Structures are given as C-alpha cells and as structure tokens.
C-alpha cells in the first residue's frame, strides 16, 4: 500500500494496513522449559544483525569529500580552492591508509563481485600517480597565487596543470574497465570530481598562465563534455548495480537498500555537484541542497527465518516512500503494545513500538500534514506524541529486541533515543534492553563533535508489520533521512548563487507531480500536470531588498513554450524556451544532456523577505512532459542591470544594419527599429552619456532608412481619408492611438462590426510607378492582440491571412513611471522575445499567436497605364473582432527568381486571360442592359418612363446590371473594380427608373421600401427582404392590409400589382370607391408564369383599369388562405405621360 501520497491532507485518521500475511509454518525450536536467562541470551545473540558500517573508512571518507566539495562550489575564491585540494588530497591519499582500495572493497561486498587483481592493481597505480601529481600541482598553485607575476611560478603551475590534466585523461578509462564498472564506481566518481575541479582552474587562471584563448576555450568545452560524460556513466552503472541486486527475499532487500544508500553517499552525491565546477555558469560561490532521501536498515534483529519474512517487493513498496516534496519531521505519535514473555524466568515481557503516525511540514510552511498509521494499533496499551518542532534529529539509538516462544519469535523495538541539535527525545516502551542500534554506523558525520558535524537529519519513519498465526511476528520501524544541506529554509544570499531544487516547493498545482529523478540531480524532479501552473516555493531573502538577482531554471522537455515566474502572485519574469530533447521519457530515464537552462535577461528585486515564488508554463507547443529540476538566483552588483542594458542596446543597434551601415538588414522590421530605440532610451544617461548619445543617433538614422524603403504612404496614419494625399482610406470604428507599452509611435485600434457587408476596414493602393517588375514585396507589421483581423495584399490575386493573436505580451498590471506614463523600460522584458511568424501555428488559414506578421506579393511586368499596383487591406467583419496593430510597411524583398518567377508569370498570364474574358462578358452584358434600360424610358434624356412599364421590367433591367462582375473588389465592396465605370453608369439609369416609377404612383410606399409605413395592417402582417426587393407577406386568411388614397374623380387609372401566391386559396387586391364601385385582381398558385417575368422568381404582374366615381378610394390586400406575397402595387393616371 502506498503510504506516501498524503500531500493533500492536513490530517488523516485512517489506519494504513501494513500487515503482511504469510502461510502458517511451524518450525522446530529448542524447548524453552527449564531454560535460564543465559541460555536465552545465547539464542538472541545469534539474532543480532550482521556487522554494519560502523567505523567504515570508505563511508566516512566520502561524506567528508562531499562536504568539502559542497563548501567549494562555484568559484569560491583562490584560498578556498587551494584549501579544497589540500583537504581532498589528505582524505583520498592519507599517509597511512589505502582509501581507494577500501572504496573497491566496500562495493565488492555489496554486489558480491571481486575485482580481478590486475584491474585493481592498475587502478591503484594510476591513482597513486594522480595523488603525486595533485600534490605537485597544489603546491605550484599555492606558490603562484602568492606571486602571480613571477615567470617561474607561472611556468611551474602551467606545467603541473598540463601534467595532471593529461594524467586524468589517461587514467579515467582504468576506472571503468569493462565488466568491473560497478565495483569501480566509487573510484570513478571521486576521480571525476577531482578532474572537473582541476579543469575549472584553466578557465579561471589560464590567461594568466600564458594559455591561448583557443586553449582555454578547448579546455572549457572539454570540461562541459566531461561533466555530461562522467554524470551519465555514474548514473548508468549505479542503476545497473541496483538492478543486479533486485531480488525476492527480505535479506536481499536489506542488501539492495544498503547498496542504494551507500552508493548515493559514495557516488551520486558527488555527481550532483559536477555541474557546479563550470566556472562560467557558476561564477561565484554557490549554495545548493541535496534533497535525495536515504533509508537506514530496518530497526530490527535479524529475522530467524528470512525466507518467510517480508518479501523484497513488500519491503520496497511499503517501507520506501514514493517521490514527494521535501518534508520535515515535526512529530511522531507512537503506539506501544506488549509481547508477553513465554517465561519471565527466561526473559521479561517486551513493551514495543507497535505503530506510529508522522506529522511533518513542507519547506517554510507552518501547516502540519499527518500520515495514516504505520503498523498495528489493535491491542495497544499506551500512546503518546514525541515532538521535534524544528529540532534536527541527527542520530538515533535504538533497542531492537525479540521475545522467544517455542515455535515463534516476536520482534519489536523497546526504546529509541532521538538525538537533536536542540535536545534529545526519548521513546521508551520499557528499559530492559540495551540501545545497540546506532544510525551513525550507517550515516557518519563529517567529523567531531557529531551535533555540529552531522551530515543527515531524520525526516520520516515508515514501518513493516508482519503477523502469522504460528510463526514470527514483528513491527519494524524504518527511518528515512535527508542530507543536512536540504535545510528547512530556502535561503537566498546576497553574495552566493542560490540553487533551490523544485522539490523544495511547498505546494504543487494539481495535477503536477514529483517523479523519481535520474540520479545526477541530487534529488527528484517536478513534472508538470495538464495545467500551466507547476507550484509554489517559499523563500527567505538574506539580503537587502535592494539586491538584484538574475534567475535561471534547469529543465528538461521536448516541447517549446513560455516559462513564467510569479513573485507574490505578480508575474515578474517571462521568456520563451525551446525543447531540450526531441523525445522524452520518464524522469528517471533522462540523461545529463536532456537538461537545459532557461535564463532571464532582466534582473529582479524581491518585494519582501519571505516571497512566494510561483512557476508557470504557457503557450506550449504540445501536451508532452516538462520536468523542472531547480531554480537559481544569481546576485548581481548595483550597476549590473545598467551595464546589461548598454550591452544589449549596442548589440541590438549593430544588428539593424548591413555592413557599412548603408541600409537596414532585410529581416529588420519597422517595429524592431522602434523597440531598439526604446532599448537605447533606457540606457542610463548618467553612467553612459556618450554611448547613449551615439546609439540614439544611429537608431534615428535607422528609422529614417525604414521610412525611405517603405512603399506605403502615411505609415503613421496621420491622414486617413485625406483628400490631399492618396494614402489610407478607412471606415468608422478605427481609433488612432499613440505611444503605449508596445508601440512607440501611432498604432491602429479596430473594433468589431454589426454588419458583415460593412466591415471595419483600412486600405491603400501602392501606385504602379513605385514598383519594379518581377520583384517580391513584403507586407509586415506588428499586432499586440487581435481576433478575426483579416490582412490582404492584392495584385493578380489576393494573399489573405486571418490573424488571431493572444493578448499575452504584457502582465495584467502594467508598470508606470511617476507621471503615470508607460514605463517602457520596465515593460521591455515582456517584449524581448515575441513569437515570429515561423514559430506561430497555422490552422484553417488562421495565423495564431504570432505578434509579428509578414505576407509576400510578387510583381510581373509593369504597366503604368493599367496601374494595377498593390492593394493593402485590413478588415474585421465580425461583431467579436478587434485588433490593435501598427508599424505597417511594404518593402522590397528582392528579385523573383526560379520557381517563384515561373509562378508569377503564370499568374500574370492567367490574370490577363481572365481580364480579356471578363471584358468580353461585360460588353455582352452592357449591350443587354442598355437595351433593357432604353426600353423603359420614353425619351433619350431618361426623363419619363413609358406608360406600360412595370415594376417587374425595371427589376429585370436592374438584375441584368447587377450581373456585371468586378464592379467592386471582391475583398471589399467599397473599393471600385475594373468594371466600376460601366456599372455606375447603368446603375444610375436603373435608379432613375425607380425614382420615376415612385413619382407616378399615387399609392404611398407601394414598393414597401419603408416597411408597413402608410398602410393599415393587422398584427400578423410583415415585410421581408427577398432578392433585393421588399416584399409584403400575408400568412393568414384573416390578415388585412388597407390604404386610402385620393384620386381625380371621373379620370381613368391603371393598377399594376406584382405578386405571388403560395399554397391553396387565392390572394387578392381590391380597389373600391365610396359609392361601392369595386374592381379586383386575383392571384393563385397554379397560374402560369410569364417567362418574361421569371427574373423575379415566380412573381406575376397583373393590371386593371379603374374609373373612380368619388375622390376617395380604398385599397385592400388580403387572401383566403395560404401565403400571399406582394412585391409592388402601383396606381397611376392613364393619361400620365411617363
């Protein structure tokens, strides 16, 4: 059962059933009758555990070497380095000792494999040579540090460095002889640690020793390669050894766990600090924490019959916790039970530790978390809490005991003394048995006194409970320990690089998890869940709040995205990251090369002494794994940030120009020029006045070059819809902004539209005279955020992109200066790395999350008479759409060649063929339309309609005119197309015909252009649009439409009605005067439609002559049933000359 997944619980009262059940098996046992106490002792002595690591020189030595290495991480200073070599040499090559041989012997015993004599002898010989060379190098280094200008001292130290470096390169293969990699692993790790430390000196001092820069770089690159090589070798063979010891029995697990514990101490703890020998990445003293957990042997005498004891898998699954955040023991609540002795004459009853539960805290947190119960509480006789409350327990002394029965033996722990730096805590079930089990034997200190030099602290206790009816019973506690360096506080120092492991978080955002580490990281890893948030770390800042820090994150992933750091829930750092590997597996399978670093270019200051640091991911390229190893804080001096700004600005300005600074680089955008100018503006004029002035002049020159190459008129949007300049033309819904966090100059703000026929738009045509033949041009710009923004560049056809860009450049709360203006210098960190078009995603023609955009357009031949030009258009056609963008430019990209040249020639030919076809088609339509329009009018001046012209005929002429294509551009209906002059001419005549038609009609609103205005109607009558005309709709037989009109008495009138009946029944229009004279037109669905009226989709025009006897006439529209649609009612004088 998993006892460890308790991070989400403040307390848990559930009992964890650790009981291990085995088949009943009786065994022969000596009779206990008449046995005295001495006879009993002779039996129990045989039950004592085998000799542990008490006084083990190998273990004692490696913990001291690890301690010395941890104290000299990074670049701690020259005196530290020489003292480090002195201490290491004294530990690994003592005058009277064979430490290297003991390293081999220790591992040989653990894996039961002897090293062949020749392999051992060769390795020892190589190590002796390295020891001698180290002694000479250390003395030469110390001598040179005392007189660094002395040529002899320089020559001596350089020579000795080359000798010992060569010896290491030559000797390392002797420490990994095929077949003996595991028993030689401690030797390999110790030698690798020394070699990497030595290579650091080349980078630090090589220039002073006369090394060439190439030689220094070669040594540095070799060091980086060796860090990776040495790390992977050690973890590979550690895992191989562990796998070799995998077994099935309790005793096999004991040995398996000892190998794991001792090889962590003798190899992996050192491997975890290999990267800190890199003097460029860790350029000052460095503080780190080893968060791995080790388990001392079970607190028990040897089980008399281990074959039926707890199994290997039961021990591993129950005694060993699953990966978890680092926690700190606060309290043990222990239950005491009793084993009754078979005979008090032989031995006393055993009051023993039968169960417990653990209360613990996370790093820098006051909340207590309590596990369920380990062991068995049934029948307990007492219980109590044993509190530690920040008291580091560095040692335990225990009294494991056994009660002997004729056929069983019951194991238990009577006492445990917990030694803490703030005092001792004593669990005592009774005091009849001696404290014989000492954790120091397995986890020795780094010297005396132990309470000051201890290396590990107790962090947790698990237990195995075994019960069988007729054989051995046991409750066995197992203690787990963390390294002393993994302290409760995450201290951030003013003068040291601080590396905080990710498992020092106090909270993970569900479903982020802790996973087993690969071995070389010094602990486990945090793996992101499906959400962006990873978790929170609490830190203690041991420096003035004015201190600034750079931040670095070590990670492994096969995805790209953005890594965000929040401080006190305020986003403080953002930067893009790339994948470190192409494919990724589980955390335990990662290699050294799987990891990379996210480094932030801007510095931070902490707002208080106990900040909360939150790690967060966004914009991930896919949903694959992301592992966090650690976050690092690197202190910088007071002017560091200003110097960084200057260097960054100088580099940025230089990248704007081609060689000779006569032109801008092709990939430099107008937006980039603006952003570089902001970088220059942010340089301190007090510290770097001359440099700032020079850079300002250069960036102004760059801006002039940007303007001069831009083919767009009015790039700053000062004269939209100007009659004086043939530049931008736009609709309503556009606002011109000026100067914010993202844009230095003017920018555009587009809002959505309620009507797709009338979008929010802005366009400009680049004149043919500005273009070159067979040349590629690029439209470029920058978008802060947008939705449904469509961008077009058009020549022979349209290049079109829909641009949806997230509003993710800046935090929710933007920095301002004392005047309330945008603090661009503070905001610049968020704009440093925005996605390029190449990093964006394209789906269904929509370019997503690319703040920079670019569209190509190619020219063919140039014809100034045709003046085809290049059209540039931006529009939004949806209500939800919006956009904020600027820095628009169209620039020459270069000649069109190769396949692109063939393609543009084909496009031009295709366009010309299409244009010729369109011209022929348009001429035919024009002839038909002109003839239809001529037939409407009574004279050439189009001043009167012919008497018999109906609405349907005018509509028919209009339909012919509307069939003319390319009257307006397809991409924006307000922009005239190639047929616009012809269309305008004919449309004017159509409009004139409708006007004359309406003028002669005495029926008000007879075409229902104004809806139901002027008509008296029932509530169920409506007007709807159909085929460009308004149509009156009657759906019910009781619907009624009325209008009274005034006519000339005794004059003749003609009534024209264009209508359509659907379904059974009939529709009718009745005209009646006051004396009751009535005429009526009827429409049914089965009437034959005149082919000449087919253009209005089934509508029929009917007419009648009416001679009123009174001035007032009543017109009624109705139906008997079904649906009746009326398109037009016209009543005009017979004698009217129309």
UniProtKB/Swiss-Prot annotation:
InterPro entries: Cry1Ac-like_dom-VII, Cry_V, Galactose-bd-like_sf, Pest_crys, Pest_crys_dom-III, Pest_crys_dom_I, Pest_crys_N_sf, Pest_cryst_cen_dom_sf. It holds the Pfam family Cry1Ac_dom-VII. Keywords: Sporulation, Toxin, Virulence. One of its GO terms (biological process) is sporulation resulting in formation of a cellular spore. Gene3D superfamilies: Galactose-binding domain-like, Pesticidal crystal protein, central domain, Pesticidal crystal protein, N-terminal domain. One of its GO terms (molecular function) is signaling receptor binding. It comes from the Bacteria. The keyword Chaperone does not apply. Belongs to the delta endotoxin family. Toxic segment of the protein is located in the N-terminus. Promotes colloidosmotic lysis by binding to the midgut epithelial cells of Coleoptera. This protein is not toxic in its natural form. It is highly toxic to Colorado potato beetle larvae after an in vitro solubilization and trypsin activation step. This is Pesticidal crystal protein Cry7Aa. It comes from Bacillus thuringiensis. The lineage of its organism: Bacteria, Bacillati, Bacillota, Bacilli, Bacillales. The gene is cry7Aa.
């Amino acid at each position: 059962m998993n006892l460890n997944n308790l991070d989400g619980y403040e307390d848990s009262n559930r009992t964890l059933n650790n009981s291990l059940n085995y088949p009943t098996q009786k065994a022969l046992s000596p009779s206990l009758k008449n046995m005295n106490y001495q006879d009993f002792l002779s039996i129990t002595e045989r039950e004592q555990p085998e000799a542990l690591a008490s006084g083990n020189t190998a273990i004692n030595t490696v913990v001291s070497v690890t301690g010395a290495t941890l104290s000299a991480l990074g670049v701690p200073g020259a005196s530290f380095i020489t003292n480090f070599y002195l201490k290491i040499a004294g530990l690994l090559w003592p005058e009277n000792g064979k430490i290297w041989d003991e390293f081999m012997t220790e591992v040989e015993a653990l894996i039961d494999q002897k090293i062949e004599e020749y392999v051992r002898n060769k390795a020892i010989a190589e190590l002796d040579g390295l020891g001698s060379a180290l002694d000479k190098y250390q003395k030469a280094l110390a001598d040179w540090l005392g007189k660094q200008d002395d040529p002899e001292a320089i020559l001596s130290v350089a020579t000795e460095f080359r000798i010992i470096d060569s010896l290491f390169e030559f000797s390392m293969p002797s420490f990994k002889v095929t077949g003996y990699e595991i028993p030689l692993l401690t030797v390999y790790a110790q030698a690798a640690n020394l070699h990497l430390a030595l290579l650091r000196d080349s980078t630090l001092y090589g220039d002073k020793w006369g090394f060439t820069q190439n030689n220094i770089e070669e040594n540095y690159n070799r060091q980086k390669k060796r860090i990776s090589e040495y790390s992977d070798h050690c973890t590979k063979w550690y895992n191989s050894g562990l796998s070799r010891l995998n077994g099935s029995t309790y005793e096999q697990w004991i040995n398996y766990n000892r190998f794991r514990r001792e090889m962590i101490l003798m190899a992996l703890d050192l491997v975890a600090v290999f990267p800190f020998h890199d003097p460029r990445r860790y350029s000052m003293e460095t503080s780190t924490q080893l968060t791995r957990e080790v388990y001392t042997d079970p607190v028990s005498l040897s089980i008399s019959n281990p074959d039926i004891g707890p199994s290997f898998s039961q021990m591993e699954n129950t005694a060993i916790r699953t990966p978890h955040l680092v926690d700190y023991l606060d309290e043990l609540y222990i239950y005491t039970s009793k084993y009754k002795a078979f005979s008090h004459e032989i031995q006393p009853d055993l009051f023993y530790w039968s169960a417990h539960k653990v209360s613990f805290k996370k790093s820098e947190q006051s909340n207590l978390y309590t596990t369920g119960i380990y062991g068995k509480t049934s029948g307990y006789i007492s219980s109590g809490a044993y509190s530690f409350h920040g008291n580091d327990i560095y040692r335990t002394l225990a009294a494991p005991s056994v009660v002997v029965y004729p056929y069983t033996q019951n194991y238990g722990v009577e006492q445990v003394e917990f030694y803490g730096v703030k005092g001792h805590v004593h669990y005592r079930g009774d005091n009849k048995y001696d404290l014989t089990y000492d954790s120091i034997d397995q986890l020795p200190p780094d010297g005396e006194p132990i309470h000051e030099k201890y290396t590990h602290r107790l962090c947790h206790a698990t237990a195995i409970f075994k019960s069988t009816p007729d054989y051995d019973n046991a409750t066995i506690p197992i203690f787990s320990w963390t390294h002393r360096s993994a302290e409760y506080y995450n201290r951030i120092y003013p003068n040291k690089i601080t590396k905080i492991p990710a498992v020092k978080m106090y909270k993970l955002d569900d479903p982020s998890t802790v996973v087993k580490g690969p071995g070389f990281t010094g602990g486990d890893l945090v793996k992101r869940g499906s959400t962006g948030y990873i978790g929170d770390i609490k830190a203690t800042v041991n420096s003035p709040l004015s201190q600034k820090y750079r931040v670095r994150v070590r990670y492994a992933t096969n995805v790209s995205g953005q890594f965000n750091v929040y401080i006190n829930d305020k986003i403080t750092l953002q930067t893009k990251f790339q994948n470190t590997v192409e494919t990724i597996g589980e955390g335990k399978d990662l290699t050294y090369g799987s990891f990379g670093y996210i480094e932030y270019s801007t510095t931070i200051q902490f707002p208080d002494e106990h900040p909360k640091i939150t790690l967060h991911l966004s914009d991930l390229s896919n949903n694959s794994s992301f592992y966090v190893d650690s976050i690092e804080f690197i202190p910088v001096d007071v002017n560091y940030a200003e110097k960084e700004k200057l260097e960054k600005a100088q580099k940025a300005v230089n990248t704007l120009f081609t060689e000779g600074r006569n032109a801008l680089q092709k990939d430099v955008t107008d937006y980039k020029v603006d952003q570089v100018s902001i970088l220059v503006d942010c340089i301190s004029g007090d510290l770097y006045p001359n440099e700032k002035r020079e850079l300002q002049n250069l960036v102004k020159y760059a801006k002039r070059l940007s303007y001069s190459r831009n083919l767009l008129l009015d790039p700053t949007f000062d004269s939209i819809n100007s009659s004086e300049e043939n530049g931008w033309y736009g609709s309503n819904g556009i606002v011109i902004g000026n100067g914010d966090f993202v844009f230095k100059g003017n920018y555009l703000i587009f809002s959505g539209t309620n009507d797709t026929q009338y979008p929010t738009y802005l366009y400009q045509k680049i004149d043919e005279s500005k273009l070159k033949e067979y040349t590629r041009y690029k439209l470029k710009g920058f978008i802060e955020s947008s939705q449904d923004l469509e961008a077009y560049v058009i020549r022979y056809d349209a290049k079109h992109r829909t641009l949806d860009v997230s509003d993710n450049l800046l935090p929710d709360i933007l920095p301002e200066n004392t005047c309330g203006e945008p603090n661009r210098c503070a905001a610049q960190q968020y704009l440093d790395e925005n996605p390029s078009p190449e990093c964006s995603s394209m789906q269904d023609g929509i370019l997503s999350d690319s703040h920079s955009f670019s569209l190509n357009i190619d020219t063919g031949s140039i014809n100034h008479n045709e003046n085809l030009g290049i059209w540039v258009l931006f529009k939004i056609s949806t209500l939800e759409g919006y956009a904020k963008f600027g820095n628009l430019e169209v620039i020459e990209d270069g000649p069109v060649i190769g396949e692109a040249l063939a393609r543009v020639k084909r496009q031009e030919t295709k366009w010309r063929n299409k244009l010729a076809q369109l011209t022929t088609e348009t001429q035919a339509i024009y002839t038909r339309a002109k003839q239809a329009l001529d037939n409407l009018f009574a004279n050439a001046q189009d001043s009167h309609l012919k008497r018999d012209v109906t609405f349907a005929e005018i509509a028919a002429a209009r339909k012919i005119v509307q069939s003319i294509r390319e009257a307006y551009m397809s991409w924006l209906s307000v922009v005239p197309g190639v047929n616009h002059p012809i269309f305008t001419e004919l449309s004017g005549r159509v409009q004139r015909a409708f006007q004359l038609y309406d003028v002669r009609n005495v029926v008000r609103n007879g075409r229902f252009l104004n809806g139901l205005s002027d008509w008296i109607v029932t509530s169920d009558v409506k007007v709807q649009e159909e085929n460009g005309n308004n149509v009156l709709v009657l759906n019910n037989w009781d619907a009624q439409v009325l209008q009274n009109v005034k006519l000339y008495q005794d004059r003749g009138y003609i009534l024209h009605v264009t209508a359509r009946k659907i379904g059974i029944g009939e529709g009718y229009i009745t005209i009646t005067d006051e004396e009751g004279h009535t005429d009526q037109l009827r429409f049914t669905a089965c009437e034959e439609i005149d082919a000449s009226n087919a253009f209005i989709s089934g509508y029929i025009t009917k007419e009648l002559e009416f001679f009123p006897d009174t001035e007032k006439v009543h017109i009624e529209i109705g139906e008997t049933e079904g649906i009746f649609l009326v398109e037009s009612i016209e009543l005009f004088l017979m004698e009217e000359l129309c």
